[in-house]
Amino acid sequence: MAPDLKQYPAYQSSRPYTRWWWLHGPFRQQDIVYQLDWLNANGFGGVELAWLDPTWQTRPDAPPRPEWLGEEWSALLGFTKRYADEIGLGCDFTLGSCWPFGGSRVRPEDAAQTLDGASPQRLYGSWESGPRPVLNHLSADALRRYADALAPAFAPGLAGTPSALFCDSGELDAGRLWSPELWDAFEARYGYRLEGRIELARTQPHMRYEYRRMVGATMQQAFFETFADICHQLGAFARVQAHGTPTDLLSAYASADVPETESLLFPPPFSRIAASAAALAGKDLVSAEAFSCIYGIVGLGDLRAARYWRREQPADLKLLADALLAHGVNQFVWHGMPFNPPGGKNEFYTSVHVGPDAAFASELPAFNEYLETVCGMMRRGRPYANLAVYLPNEDMLLRDRVPDDQRTPGAMFEWEMRQVAPPPETAGYHPLWISEPFLREGIGVDGDLVVGNVRFSALYLNVEWLASGALEQVARLAAEGVRIVLVREPKLPGMRRNAQYAGWLAALAAAPNVRASLAAFDVQPLMQGASVPPYWAREGQGELLLFLANPLAAQVRYPMLYGQSLSESAIDCPVTITYGGVSHEVALRFEPYRSIMLRVTRDGQATVLDLDYVPPPPVPDEQTSSEQKRG
């Protein structure tokens, strides 16, 4: 049985966590106490332990590490958790060393497979010695055997206050991923066999689409749902980064107790997918691995990133944080802090560096208090819902590689959804993503679409391709009276035809509640204005809370310019906010480095709530200054 999420420290407090990289030792109890005390004194709410071999930082004098999963290692986990409990910090653990899951505890028959046979992919940078195969993420039995092998060593760390077990992003060899039992399952589902068509499964768009759909559906059940079940059996929560897998990301994120996004390798608008999944599934927390690689990746030989290594500026960090808050994040996990004794020199190879020697150490208490305050507010009530926008899963699965000019480190395929964002015309409607599995749960009520506890005024689709199962649900919802915006007529993806597809399209074309534009319906946007800033809204007890990010947050992408947050004057954004049938004219004024929290009541009152923290003005470099002048 799943533990009560209300007992999770990250639920009880909105203070940010940090990833805690255990790299070089020695790993001594007094140093564990030293770092946890420092975190507690600087506004952190917990840690997430992660173990890596720091190949980027050779230290011949470093003592041997405790044996992976050995008695000493397990005892250190137990001590860390007990002391974290004692001082009121949360303590989570990555279920493995490195990512994705794998290592010496993976049986040969449980190792990852491809369309061509055994996968050559191996873990790089694992804490342990010995074989490092990647786990077969398409086999529930393989995942359970892997977890069973690790569970005894993790048991001392899982005692006491409930912890989360963390699954990092799925950086798999996803272009060829397979499992032997899928040959027959694929034929049963699609009516033909893939043997002899392997090259077509990689190159023919519609066959490749069906291959990816098969892999994604299998991974949803065999990995994400199974992982959550394993966590619950161990008395833990599942905190999961589902991105990097060809699944329906909404379903994959919704399988976790705490869906987790990341930025900045994924742009801030990407976080709306995890936040939408949480809203649809009734999850309270949306966490983010935050600030990673903010100016680039030093480990990839990026000279520009190396120039700013360990020189991170609080104003830039706050601008990125505000961008994430405006897309639904309400729990931060700093990336990250290396294990260090007093005066230690261990460091991770990408930003940011958290610790007493951080460039921004003096700002941490105030900045973390700001994150705690805003995240706490963004947990009140429930996410505001107005417009459900169909996530273009089919469009992205049919495409292949990310164009070179759009590629960021680690980005490979369009189905990763890194660049997907709701259409601009939907911005004022506070759009939430939706996909086929959640359409199946939906019902029509007085023209609205109701999914669980979420009620939308309309369903919006603007896709080139739509699976027959999804179109069937859209037609059903239309018959139930749901307002539907069908911007263009979709086409059926895949190799097989469906005799009912044309009929569903015809029924939609004839339905009076199906239109080609939002303007055809009397659905009021939440916010209107010449320039709507990035925002997120939550509703409860007759009021609306809106976090409105500084408009500069809309420009945050990888990599940020050094000092990109520089702002010398206020930005005025007059908007009209319509809530409860009442419109409010609000003159938003964003002072430099500040965002706004707005409370709107149904009786027409709009109040700006004070967010105290203002970071020191950044010092830009010449490139930033010149680009801002051109802008």
Outline where the language-model segments fall.
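Acidic/proline-rich low-complexity IDRs
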Residues: 4, 114, 122, 608-610
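Catalytic and substrate-binding clefts that recognize carbohydrates or anionic sugar/phosphate headgroups
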Residues: 100-156
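Bacterial/eukaryotic Sec-type N-terminal signal peptides
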Residues: 1-2, 630
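N-terminal regions that are enriched for targeting/export leaders
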Residues: 3-5, 36, 40-42
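Carbohydrate-binding surfaces of carbohydrate-active enzymes
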Residues: 12-17, 22, 28-33, 46-49, ...
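Surface-exposed aromatic
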Residues: 60
